Amino acid sequence: MRTSPPFRADHVGSLLRPPALLRARETLTGDALREAEDEAIREVVRRQEEIGLQSATDGEFRRASWHMDFIYRLGGIGQATDEHITVRFHNEQGDIEFTPAALRVHERIRLNEPIFADDFAFLRDTVTSRNSGVVPKLTIPSPSMVHYRGGPAAIDPAVYPDVEEFWRDLSAAYAEQVRRIGALGCTYLQFDDTSLAYLNDPAQRAELSSRGDDAEHMHLRYIKQINAALAAKPAGMTITTHMCRGNFRSSWAASGGYDHVAEALFGELKVDGFFLEFDDERSGGFEPLRFVPPGKMVVLGLVTTKRGELESKDTLKRRIDEAAKFVDLDQICLSPQCGFSSTVEGNQLTADEQFAKLRLIVETAQEVWG
């Protein structure tokens, strides 16, 4: 088994909020809510350790949304409360919509203070106090998500008459975030990035083209900006990225394999590992993994978080073998395809089903890699 992240058995980040915490979010504020979150996080860290995971997150228990909670805290970005972003998600029963407030870049982008710093410090101290050797992991949205969610219309041309200045400021703010979080002791940081998966879907590219983006080449811009944000990452910090096609209340937003982005994504993005959604036919085949260079890790998201039904070990092992035809088995790890609760509402499965899936991942990884 691996002793550094990403681990053979790993997970993306978000976990179902306990009912008591959901009630607390409705009735408590300030210190009282923080105490309820602290209690829930201590317990979920214990559960991750008990299952046998080598990394632990705080389940994103303090967030309402995996990405917007972060993005709105960047200096220069605000909520356009009179307008909403509409993201349409799909499931077997039909369509549902996620409608956060739209964002506006109204000043030059900057990092006023490290975002989620107190949250990470609490997770770090909780993990350290247990003396289990588990590595605390922080997840944040990729810089790509600021542009993907807002688009050109969200950027005030009076602030950024030259869009290249927008990109430079955005990457600089993220670079400072990475540095400051590293100074707090973070050695495992993940950039969550649905955009690089969405761009494989022709319908998504058509939508970006309609708003004025160069959709066919947008993934190259996003890769460039992520690399700029990571150019001075702290020594000893592992950076991974997670990609999926949407995860809201057991629904998805996009479909398509990784073919459109694969060669540039795997060959040029300067991260240590890729968490990739592969739980059903929407994700395509494993053939794009042939572009993964030696030394980079691929975390196969073979276990779905969208349903409670437990996968079989034999099926997981067979699919790992299939992936190993395109990338060396020693470069492969195993995880769920996404988080279990990308937003506070969570996916449609129980906490017991969630933890059973994480336990299955640990057991399968032990049997495959020893």
Model-based region annotation:
Residues M1-G370:
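Domain-level signal for soluble alpha/beta catalytic cores
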